[in-house]
Amino acid sequence: MQRTCVLIVLIVTSTMWTPDPDVYAQPRGFNYDEAQVPKYTLPDPLVMVDGTKVTSAKQWNDKRRDEVQQLFEAYMYGKVPDGETELIFTDAKGERALGGAAIRKQVKISFGEKEDAPAMDLLIYLPADAKVRVPVFLGLNFHGNHTIHKDKEIWLTESWVRTNKKFGITKNKANELSRGVAAGRWQIEKAIAKGYGVATIYCGDIDPDFNFPSNGIQAYYYKKDQTIPEKGQWGTIAAWAFGLSCAMDYFETDTDIDHKKVAVLGHSRLGKTSLWAGAIDTRFALTISNCSGCGGAALSRRRFGETVRRINTSFPHWFCSRFHQYNDKEDKLPIDQHMLIALCAPRPVLINSATEDKWADPHGEFLAAQGADAVYRMLGTGGLDAKKWPEPNKLVKSTIGYHLRPGKHDVTARDWDVYIEFADHHMTGGAE
């Protein structure tokens, strides 16, 4: 889908994530034993569908890369509809925030001029006294922009939000009780101190995370009389990734942001999203996946932890409908997740896992990173500089990076230390 952009400037003066129970509980009845992983053969990312071997960077760039992307679009994530979208940026003037350490911007991005056009709110924090354009970490959040910090000026989302009594969220509506509940997962001050900006969008602004085909951005692009996505059309993860690319469109208009140095990141289902966004939108300089598991960085053929059948049963809207035909038939897939990582090549990618997060198969995430190595090396990078699964807390800083954090399915301050160290090494040379 082609996008054109219109910027509207308004001068404004100012007078979470919910842990998914079936992720945290490591559900019974699934394999968590490495000895029980079935034998499998991964598709070779350097062999075309017709059997032709890819032996040069030119072949990869001219033919195989597009072929792999089309396979993922056709059989897994779905394809964004053809056509053009005119994005409307309503830009709130930046204001001092976080005790003067940051500039806060809030931008409403509308997907067209029609009154019923959907819109998403982009929240941005930038170092207040930056002398040059700022590199940025961009990611989606689970429960609204207001949950990532206690900053009282962050807009409350008007979109549907999953009810969560622990966070004070009732009747699927955001309120003040949930302000800052996910702040631990968004180390804003840490990133600002290191010279980075942080930007986020509530995923539900783009497409609410439940199986109802007539809501969200997808329905806005239906053809006349269409009520559900067609067989190979985008699922929710692809819609979320589209939203991230639209945020990048905005960054290209903002002279405070270095749009050549944007890292796209995400956790869990939003880590699946960041990988897909980084794979298909080459404007992202760096891609970070945090505990993304099945449908993200973990190899489907291992059937370790969450499986294709389980994810399609629990979340039938995340992927295109064709992906469902591979329930219990992972070996018949023409793709696996090492090929998704390979689509990011030669740009750096970081796979961040957690030792206790067996549902997301941290070892399978590492093996997928290994499986992408040959593509990266063909394109002239160092690939993955690890022959075996690294010990916890050891950051592998090669172009394909890997880190295994002790602990559970989460995003922690330690994870942000790793993100920043990896970005310093590959994207900025040290942003400070």
Curated annotation (Swiss-Prot):
Activity over temperature: Optimum temperature is 35 degrees Celsius with p-nitrophenyl acetate as substrate. Above 35 degrees Celsius, activity significantly decreases, while 30% of the maximum activity is recorded at 10 degrees Celsius.
Residues holding substrate: 272, 359
Function recorded in the entry: Displays some glucuronoyl esterase activity in vitro, since it is able to hydrolyze methyl 4-O-methyl-D-glucopyranosyluronate, allyl D-glucuronate, benzyl D-glucuronate and D-glucuronic acid methyl ester. However, esters of glucuronic acid are probably not its biological substrate, as they are not present in the marine environment. Can also hydrolyze a range of other esters, including p-nitrophenyl acetate.
Protein name listed in UniProt: Carbohydrate esterase MZ0003
Cofactor notes: Does not require metal ions for activity.
SUPFAM superfamilies assigned: alpha/beta-Hydrolases
Keywords: Carbohydrate metabolism, Hydrolase, Periplasm, Polysaccharide degradation, Serine esterase, Signal
Enzyme class: hydrolase
Family in the record: Belongs to the carbohydrate esterase 15 (CE15) family.
An annotated GO cellular component: periplasmic space
Activation/inhibition comment: Is inhibited by PMSF and by NaF in vitro, which is consistent with the catalytic nucleophile being a serine.
Extent of motif GXSYXG catalytic site motif: 266-271
pH dependence: Optimum pH is 8.0. Shows more than 60% of its maximum activity in the pH range of 7.0-9.5. 20% of the activity is retained at low pH range and at pH 10.5, while no catalytic activity is found at pH 5.0 or 10.5.
Active-site residues per Swiss-Prot or TrEMBL entry: 268 (nucleophile), 409 (charge relay system)
